[in-house]
Amino acid sequence: MRILLVNYRYFISGGPEKYMFNIKKMLEDNGHEVIPFSIHSNKNVETEYSKYFVEPIGSRDATYFEECKKTPKVIWQMLTRSIYSTEVEKAIKKEIKDVKPDLVYIIHFVNKLSPSVICGAKKMGVPVVLRLSDYFLLCPRFDFMYNKKPCEECLTKGYRTCIKKRCVKGSLFASVVRVFSMKVHKAMNIYKDVDAFITPSEFLKKKLIENGFDENKITCIPTFTASKSEVGKPQVGTYGLYFGRVTEEKGVDTVVKAYEMMPDRHVKIMGDDTTDEAKRLKAYIKEKNIKNVEFLGFKAGEELEEIIKGARFTLIPSIWYDNLPNTALESFQYSKPVIASNIGSLPELVLNGVNGYLFKPADAQELCEKVALLDDDAVVKKMGAASRAKLEDRFAPQTHYDTLMRIFESVRRK
């Protein structure tokens, strides 16, 4: 099968891109041809198909809109990429005409490529499968968050709530643009052209169905990770570990506050420590003279693996509807118990008392109580083994591949 893989970045910057390159390799290992469509960036992995890529908003050095100079051209690009880009439609139709894919598999496109990738593919008669990594179809700011708490007012009171509260980046302009684009897409009925939706979690699938999406078009296929037997043996480490984005919705401040109350225990926080939230938390730690919370910064490769191996357990303290984070699967891979917030998809990953513990989001005191439950080495080993078993049972690469191929074959036959 020849598959056109669409994502607005062709380099690893987060979970969706890790998935993109992992699924690309898996499909190719199984004899399929995978062809990318993306946006030019100086960070991109090299590919002969970059000649079909479109120019970014701003410069090829910028990853985020905030890094771009706000020239009239950049603002116009931002508007068209948010609403509908004829430039992108023309580019993807050109690539489809030349490479003749059997289907298009879309990972991320919002605000960078626009849903013209969907329309362009359908105009060329090619079926479209869309994987959802967040809540962009339902929430203007993608994460159902307002004022550090889950918020679904746009679903119950309408999208004017977003404009009133300036939910998108705290900006009236950005909020108006995002709401307007969602209304345009709804009026155009763009998502009717999607032949199948893939969700990583049952939680996201349920949200879509509750809000009018066709249940028959939605399949939950959890993210996968490779099962490495040489790193899967349970080891009892000496510290708690948070690894991932250090941003407000990830709830890292709950970890800091909990360990402030547990000065005899040690926690490491691994992730980009230059974010606004990381700077705020590091300043708090310095002000309060907290000695047992260690920021490691971003780590990768063998260094990342060794830090996870050395952990006693890992922490996922999210305060948003986290949508099957890769960090959970990586924890399972290394046979680590996970202490996670009882929110979003996390209860699908952590069975309380079996492979970890759940606690009330943002409740530092309850987090302390759950950490204390893992003082017993035997419990840590048992729960770590349960994490590994869950990985191999539900998140194995072959399971993901088999389910995905059933979807691909079904949309081809339509």
Language model regions located:
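A conserved mid-protein helix/loop that constitutes part of the nucleotide-sugar donor-binding site
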Residues: 18, 245-261
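Acidic donor-binding loop of glycosyltransferase active sites
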Residues: 309-323, 336
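Nucleotide-activated donor-binding/catalytic signature segment of Leloir-type glycosyltransferases, i.e.
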Residues: 279-302
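N-terminal subdomain of nucleotide-sugar transferases
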Residues: 1-49, 124-127, 260
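Conserved acidic donor-binding segment of nucleotide-sugar-dependent glycosyltransferases
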Residues: 352-353, 357-364, 371-378
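A short, well-ordered alpha-helix in the C-terminal region of glycosyltransferases
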Residues: 366, 379-394, 400-406
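Donor nucleotide-sugar binding/catalytic pocket of nucleotide-sugar-dependent glycosyltransferases
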Residues: 137, 156-230
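A conserved catalytic-core segment of Leloir-type glycosyltransferases
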Residues: 29-99, 103
